Regions:
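Extracytoplasmic entry segments of secretory-pathway proteins
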Residues: 1-149, 161, 240-241
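Extracellular/periplasmic metallocenter environments
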Residues: 18-30, 124-241
Length: 241
């Protein structure tokens, strides 16, 4: 077989493997997780989405993995039954998304301090506030375009949708705080973070994930929960009219 023919054969084989991986993720991983539907919760072109990130989770297979949870629309964030262990959610197209993130996990310095910068939000900023416990603030609310994870222990994870140019550092509780020990977290110290962005005018599926090396026990911290849907990686379905 000639060299060009071998190259073509290898490229075709690689493409088939890649397509197979996409099929497995789409049909076996995503297909087994529930999707929290926020499309019917939108009003006046606005929808409020609530997440939390935790130092552990309530699964039987990987309970020690850090994870995101999605709250049911309009639920009470301090009731365990309000939270769904999934990273799949759906929102309407051409809608302002007001996102709230309850950060219960400790800090992990980002590998690149680019992830300390707020990118793609409306106004280019986000707000955060530290809490000692449910609705017990520790200090004032800060509005910022940067949460420097290198100068001090401040960033727990990130929420990023690369295809929308959206990257937000998620604040961690105070470095001396005792972290939540039972997920979903409804008590203990946390950071409360808020930011807004607009969904595209068309429907589609958009991958989101954390870019902080939060995969403890894996090489470079980038494996395990960081790349697994249902933990620190997820999908936002934008539903067109």
């Amino acid at each position: 077989m000639s060299v060009p023919a071998r190259v073509v054969t290898l490229l075709v084989a690689f493409a088939l493997v890649a397509l197979g991986a996409v099929y497995v993720v789409a049909h076996f991983v995503v297909g087994t997780l529930p999707t929290v539907d926020y499309t019917h919760a939108a009003s006046g072109g606005v929808v409020n989405v609530v997440l939390q990130e935790t130092p552990e989770n309530d699964s039987s297979s990987k309970p020690d993995w850090v994870s995101y949870y999605v709250m049911k629309p309009g639920a009470n964030p301090f009731q365990p039954s309000s939270w769904v262990h999934t990273t799949l959610l759906s929102v309407p197209a051409n809608t302002r998304v007001n996102m709230t993130v309850y950060g219960y996990d400790g800090c992990t310095p980002p590998r690149n301090n680019l992830w300390s910068e707020v990118q793609g939000t409306l106004g280019g900023v986000m707000s955060f506030r530290q809490f000692l416990n449910a609705n017990k603030p520790k200090g004032p609310t800060f509005v910022t375009s940067t949460l420097n994870g290198w100068s001090h222990c401040a960033v727990g994870h990130t929420f990023a949708i690369p295809s929308l140019g959206l990257f937000i550092p998620v604040a961690s509780p105070d470095a001396s705080a005792s972290l939540c020990a039972t997920a979903p977290c409804v008590a203990g110290p946390y950071s409360l973070e808020k930011f807004s962005f607009r969904t595209p005018p068309h429907g589609g599926d958009f991958r989101w994930q954390c870019f902080v090396p939060c995969g403890g026990g894996f090489e470079f911290g980038t494996g395990g929960p960081m790349q697994t849907i249902g933990y620190m990686s997820g999908q936002m379905a934008v539903v067109g009219a």
